[in-house]
Amino acid sequence: MSYVRTALLGIAFLAMATMALSTPAIAASGKPKYYFKISNIISQDEKIIPVARELLEKEVASRPEFTMDLGDANSEEAQIAEIHKQGMLGFQVSMRIASLKVDIKPPAPGKRDQQMAIDVKLAVFGHTLPGNKLLFTGDGDASLMGEFSERLKDKEEDRFMRTALSSAIKQAVSTAVAKLTTAKLEDRKSGKGKKSKAKP
């Protein structure tokens, strides 16, 4: 599956670079700074929604700066109170899968098996909780192509789909983290500027 590996290598490096630029101080603190409540997953292909939600939740859970767990706080009022109690920022996060294409191509020269090409483009959106104000977005895309055995077509398509979605989601979340960190720093600078102007 060298085609798959090659197609995703650049995406992996981009995601790692974005993560490195985001917020090492948050990760070092060991305490979540943001609460993410996964809400809508939008896709023309409704069959892919459960998988997309699972992969988005997995990606968010892998990052120490985020949490999706507020204990027994079930109502929105209780969630907001718990967010403030823990000193976090809360966001309602949604994801839109803009395009998801699967193409079957002829075998590569000298090969017997056909090739499967998958291309996915998506975006995540974060609205403040409370407030419902759009604060950040993150775009992600991934393309891969690999050989597959006809008798294992369905299984390979599922595996390829998960790989492409996972890579695109990682890229989108990494971009969102960078934007979220930048927005927070700008708010702090703005706050300091207002305080300094208030002095006589």
Question: Could you say what each language-model-derived stretch is?
Answer:
Residues 1-11:
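Bacterial N-terminal signal peptides that target proteins for export
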Residues 9-20:
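Bacterial N-terminal signal peptides
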Residues 21-74, 141, 150, 177-200:
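A structural "domain/chain start" motif
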Residues 42, 103, 146-148:
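Gram-negative outer-membrane beta-barrel proteins
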Residues 69-87:
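Short acidic low-complexity segments
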Residues 75-78, 99-103, 142-144:
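Solvent-exposed loop/turn segments at secondary-structure junctions
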Residues 81-135:
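Surface-exposed short loop/turn segments
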Residues 112-117, 127-179:
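Short secondary-structure boundary motifs at beta->alpha junctions and helix caps
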